[in-house]
Swiss-Prot record:
<dbReference type="Pfam" id="PF02348">
    <property type="entry name" value="CTP_transf_3"/>
</dbReference>
<protein>
    <recommendedName>
        <fullName>Uncharacterized protein MJ1063</fullName>
    </recommendedName>
</protein>
<dbReference type="InterPro" id="IPR029044">
    <property type="entry name" value="Nucleotide-diphossugar_trans"/>
</dbReference>
<dbReference type="InterPro" id="IPR003329">
    <property type="entry name" value="Cytidylyl_trans"/>
</dbReference>
<dbReference type="GO" id="GO:0005829">
    <property type="term" value="C:cytosol"/>
</dbReference>
Amino acid sequence: MKIIGIIQARTGSKRLKNKVLLKLGDRCILEILLERLKKSKKLDDIIVATTIKKEDNAIVELCNSLGVNVFRGSEKDVLDRFYNASKFYSGDVIVRITGDNPLTSIELIDKQVEYLLKNNFDYVSTKNIILGLSSEVFTFDALEKAWKNAKEKYQREHVTPYIYENPNLFKVFYLEPPEYLKREGIRLTIDTIKDFKLYLELQKHFDLINVDIRQIIDFLDKNPQIKNINSNVRQKSYREVEE
């Protein structure tokens, strides 16, 4: 049983170009995420899945310099990229992580993997938590079925909708999140320049590789002027696709 974390990352985001390579202190966003993921007790391997586009050579070079496995695939059909990366690296269970969420909860990753394995679920995630902390866990078999059957553009771009939209075909489970993560009004994903500015403020006060999420939440509650930097950023629906 091999459990792999796959980080989807590219430089061509429309709202914030090169975002995963932007520096927070002496490390870029993707590097901070990679370092944090090393704390997981469940992941056997971590792979960065980027695109075949020339502009993403920089991501490949970074991964090579860090000794991190990398896979290149379709830019728009991210489901195909995940399927082929999982197949290439022989993953039985896959954790989907996005490269613009450097503070992805390691606690939740490990709990989700545990629940999936103990209960023979096909898919496990966590709803209603601070944006930027979540991940998804699913079996290779579920991924393969989605890869074969998903037809809609958004299902191909966002990887997992075909799975969780079909609970009659898959055993889908959502963990109850810890109370401290059930918060509205805090946004910790990096999608826009405002999101990045908030992280620049956090970086002044914390070691982002080792900080506990509770410290971040407490800090933002005590500093609403920082918390509100990105409060008016619109979060896109998973059914929206980039043309």
